Every structure is written in C-alpha cells, then in structure tokens.
Amino acid sequence: MFERAGRRTGLGGALTYAGDTKVKDSFREEWGINTGASVLKTITMPSSDVIEQALDVYQTGLRKPSYMLWVVDYSGSMSGKGKSGAVKGLQAALDTDQARASHIEPGDDDVNVFIPFNGDAKVAQTAQDKQTATLLTAGENQPASGGTDIYNALEVALRNLPSDRDDYTVAIALLTDGQSQTGKLDEFKQQYKRDGKGVPIFSIMFGDADPEQLNDLATLSNGKVFDGRNGDLSSIFREVKGYN
C-alpha cells in the first residue's frame, strides 16, 4: 500500500486507509502531519497570456545566447521545391513574427551566420541579436544553380565558429537535399575532429533528399537529421533549439 509508505492516495489528498495501523504510523500527528484534505490547496494555473509572456522572456532574455550557423544549399538540384523549402525554413527560424509564434525568436545577444553554397561556399554573412532581415533577404534572393559541395561549406562554417565558445550555445544547421557531388567526407571528418569542438550538425532535408551522407554527419557530430519536407518546420526548429 502506498499510504503505508507515506503517500496520500485519497481524493483531494485525504487518506483512504486512515484507520490502518501502519498508515497511522506513517502519518503521525506528533510529527505535525495533518491528514485532513483541507490542508492541501490547489494551485491556480496562470492564464495563457502569462505563460506566453514567460516563454517570451525566457527565449529573448534569460537563456544562454545562441550562435547558429545556417549552411544553406543553393545548388541546381535544390531548384524549385528544394529552394522554396529552404527559404521557408529560414523564415520559420529568423523571421521575427514567425519565430515568436513558435517561441524560437532570436534573443538580444544571439548571433546568426548565413553561409549559402553550391559547388563553392559563398561569403558568410552575420547578423547580431534580432537584426535578421538582411539574412532573410539574402536567402530569398540567392539563385539555385551549379553543383553541390556540402563539405566545403561545412569547412567554412567551422572557420566561422566563435572564439569565445563558452559564451554561446553553438550549432550548425545544414539545409540541403543531401546530394553532395564530392567525396570529401574523410577529409571533413579530420577537420571536424580538429576544429569542430563538439558542435552538433543538424541536417534538414529538402528536395530529392538523400539522407545517407547526412546521417554520417549526424553520427560524427552527435547531431540529427530532420525531414523538412513535411511542412512542420516550426516543430523541427523547436527541437533544434532544444538541443541548442
């Protein structure tokens, strides 16, 4: 019986077996224990508005600042639905209004780094705190063409990691169809072991995704592979932020 072990089981906190000798021994009055249900009061839950505000305060002011590197595939194979999905992913995470609705909006001290790539990695662009509009514009206007070299782009991401890593929670988000045309995985593994500092790589698949290469990256970095084609991008980024 739970009550013999000191656990109340009755409705409202009352004792169901108050007359049991061993139950009485666990709930002794001389210890100051009141076995009446009247001493146990319910707690009024806060309103939804209060909960929303508390979540916003945590996301934008209390949690450790994040340093996110967005490595986004703009190769020819991403043309059409692939690019459209990747842009929607960026909007879900970096558009202030969309991100706020999912409680993943950037905070005052967050850093976001945008690295577009195809066969070559482009110049990294950085946004401080909530000023992400320029990154979104760059992401929307980037054409999808050329070949694909995921590993070169990730090498650029490693070179853009913060020197003061302890001040941030750092992660790399790779948005791609997973069809890298180069066999540089072994070289990248060596660089990651040297420079990666345990930063997780979260791959989000779009277009005609091939998860095989992405699973290798997840295993290497203790990251994870997500399918961004199911339309529920907010849930994906909430989980990424949960790791973050």
Model feature map: region roles:
Residues F2-A14, Q98-G107, N112, G146-T148:
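Surface-exposed patches in mature extracellular/periplasmic domains of secreted proteins
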Residues Q59-L62, D95, A99-G107, R159-Y168, ...:
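Surface-exposed acidic, glycine-flexible loop patches that form ligand/cofactor-binding
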Residues F2-M68:
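Extracellular/periplasmic juxtamembrane helices and adjacent flexible linkers that interface
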Residues P65-Y67, D108-N112, R165-V170, D195-F202, ...:
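Loop/turn elements at helix/coil->beta-strand transitions in domains of secreted/extracellular proteins
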